[in-house]
Amino acid sequence: MKILVIGPSWVGDMMMSQSLYRTLQARYPQAIIDVMAPAWCRPLLSRMPEVNEAIPMPLGHGALEIGERRKLGHSLREKRYDRAYVLPNSFKSALVPFFAGIPHRTGWRGEMRYGLLNDVRVLDKEAWPLMVERYIALAYDKGIMRTAQDLPQPLLWPQLQVSEGEKSYTCNQFSLSSERPMIGFCPGAEFGPAKRWPHYHYAELAKQLIDEGYQVVLFGSAKDHEAGNEILAALNTEQQAWCRNLAGETQLDQAVILIAACKAIVTNDSGLMHVAAALNRPLVALFGPSSPDFTPPLSHKARVIRLITGYHKVRKGDAAEGYHQSLIDITPQRVLEELNALLLQEEA
């Protein structure tokens, strides 16, 4: 059986989608699974053994471009896929499998995609509370799994593999010392400061960890580099020698390898949180207005700290006013306690 998956366009969603690929492979061991996704996803997809080929989606996230999607779909006809799974909810994301003439096209209804999809699932959000459950459910025939409780346990969570050789090579590439164990911080998050633990809290935690004998490495995109510099600026000269701001300095694949080399990770609710979980790194995840009830880190080594309940809409406009109070209220001491408990467990 040949399968095409139209993958998501965000790091976290792409990581969670691996649970679908793992489930499909477990159900259909001979299946060949290709994933169409933005080209930047290739470093993640290349580490997923279930994925045969990562096919770059050449069209932008927001562009409809029906003519181009028709052309793209027609170009895939020679691959003769038997099934397609469409993970984004948008109308346009269902066009390529339709134009490719794939006989069985599965996805949640989303933007009223009757016709484009011929195996349409209607989402009951209460029956399927977690995004990863919604992805996995698509691997089963319609009607068999009525709620998340019906899914076979344990769920096949995302797993990325990184070799020891890759870790030592990449640490050397960035001149990271082998004298001290690394703790990774992921201080960025989409939509500005609203989902971020304050930089001054990260700085205070970094001071304590460096004084305890660790080195701290900051990960993220170029947008997070300034936040990293704010953390660095709060440290004294001696401490700064053991803190590296690599936000915006690494390719995604290098960040994956270096996160795998860390003893533990402290992170906001971000795509890199899901990467760290898939690498089975001990991690402390800090949530504020966004809720871990929908997209928690999928790992038994994760501790979530959140001081409020429910879902609070994160608006870009509000974010300009600064950090969310519920994240300000999470103290560095609380995070350090959770982190130390995880590190002790890891050594046991």
Residue positions per predicted region:
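Catalytic machinery of carbohydrate-active enzymes
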Residues: M1-A348
